[in-house]
Amino acid sequence: MKEPLIFDLSRPGRKGYSLSPCDVPEVPLESIIPASLLRKEAVELPEVAENEVVRHFVRLSNLNYHVDKNMYPLGSCTMKYNPKVNDYTCDLSGFSALHPLQPTSTTQGALQLMYELSNMLAEIAGMAGVSLQPAAGAHGELTGILLIKKYHEVRGDKRHKLLVVDSAHGTNPASAALAGYETISVKSNGDGRTDLEDLRSKLDGDVAALMLTNPNTIGLFEKEIVQIAEMVHANGSLLYMDGANMNALLGITRPGDMGFDVMHYNLHKTFAAPHGGGGPGSGPVGVNEKLLPYLPAPLVVKEGDTYRLTSGGDDSIGRMMNFYGNFAVLVRAYTYIRMLGAEGLRRVSENAIINANYLLSKLLERYELPYPKPVMHEFCLSGDKQKKAHGVKTLDIAKRLLDYGFHAPTIYFPLIVSEALMIEPTETESKETLDIFADALLAIAREAEENPDVVKMAPSTTAVKRLDEATASRQLTICCM
């Protein structure tokens, strides 16, 4: 049943509150607030009893989909189960009751956590130093690009181009543009990896860096990464890694060892902080020795048994946000790493890779794989066969999956795959869950052949049915007051 808006539940005179009688003299508002600031009409607030308000929001919460309810297969999002011990440590009063402006003598535990987390992240990725300030992945990207820009500026090298592989996240060129760079696209080859000849043809004296994701967005490891790093560095450019897919690399290999100069982590993804509702995120940036002087300040340093914040050197790019990053996410990531240890982190990536390849092997029965396997932690199928043969688009398949009780995967991304259906099962899903999910997608493929209208009209069991997306894209009014 469709849940009405809270305003539709409103009835004149109903109240969900009880206030004590006013114990001060009442005065006309006009006598204390300028008339120009007063409303001309009464504010339109819903009048609803307390029990109806509670029931309304409980019903809405039951409609919500989240990783505690079922598998969340969004590709390139790493929607893994978030251990509840992370929330327990985050709620400890020694962390939750702190204020960032307290004297550092009273926040030694928090500073120790930040110091140790920075060191652990640096070790995991093979970097020389880490800043915890960036608030999300794209914010980390921007920070990394500004570090690259500072590196070249200090050398008097006025480079104005950034190379971005065509399978990259959309935030890569957006972050580059925000930092003032011209973005040049590098093609993928027939195997879905970086085309070295196209890269070579675009490397010139104006190129500040190449932005790369490894594994890339279709789940393939860039096997020629060492050669790519050599080509980029020989050009005087730097190599940036988007850490969106670090869940495939933990304990197996390190970006710093591959030749990357700078990267960002997504703590909310790889290190298990809830982000299905939009955040908060955390996108720390790791750098090698050549970029250390430019890291955002403040950083935490240890002197004897005491921790303190530094103001950064003369070449630091300065603050990237107020205070010290999204601290609650840092606590969760620290807990996750300490709970698992080095061996546990490696098992995370191994199991993520196993799950992705197992699920892929089942789905190849009816879906096309545009690039060769094996894959790493995720894969990208194509719905071209269903579209050409039966008029069923990837969008239809994704909508129909809702009727089977699953959140849809990422669709129509990356752009190099036609009718893309990108799936990342993560390491936390069992074989039984993967089997049920695979059976659902295979059933939808059969429906596309035998009764395509069922798929085209989906979803049919959700509270909100298929939206008129064409009208929504043309009429952009989203709120009526």
UniProtKB/Swiss-Prot annotation:
Enzyme class: oxidoreductase
Subunit (UniProt): The glycine cleavage system is composed of four proteins: P, T, L and H. In this organism, the P 'protein' is a heterodimer of two subunits.
Record-given protein name: Probable glycine dehydrogenase (decarboxylating) subunit 2
MF terms in GO: glycine binding; glycine dehydrogenase (decarboxylating) activity; pyridoxal phosphate binding
Catalytic activity: N(6)-[(R)-lipoyl]-L-lysyl-[glycine-cleavage complex H protein] + glycine + H(+) = N(6)-[(R)-S(8)-aminomethyldihydrolipoyl]-L-lysyl-[glycine-cleavage complex H protein] + CO2
CDD domains registered for this protein in UniProt: GDC-P (cd00613)
Family: Belongs to the GcvP family. C-terminal subunit subfamily.
SUPFAM superfamilies for the chain: PLP-dependent transferases (SSF53383)
Enzyme Commission code: 1.4.4.2
Keywords, sorted A to Z: Oxidoreductase, Pyridoxal phosphate
GO BP annotations listed: glycine decarboxylation via glycine cleavage system
Keyword NADP applies: no
Main function: The glycine cleavage system catalyzes the degradation of glycine. The P protein binds the alpha-amino group of glycine through its pyridoxal phosphate cofactor; CO(2) is released and the remaining methylamine moiety is then transferred to the lipoamide cofactor of the H protein.
Cofactor: pyridoxal 5'-phosphate
Modified residues (N6-(pyridoxal phosphate)lysine): 269
CC terms in the record's Gene Ontology section: cytosol; glycine cleavage complex
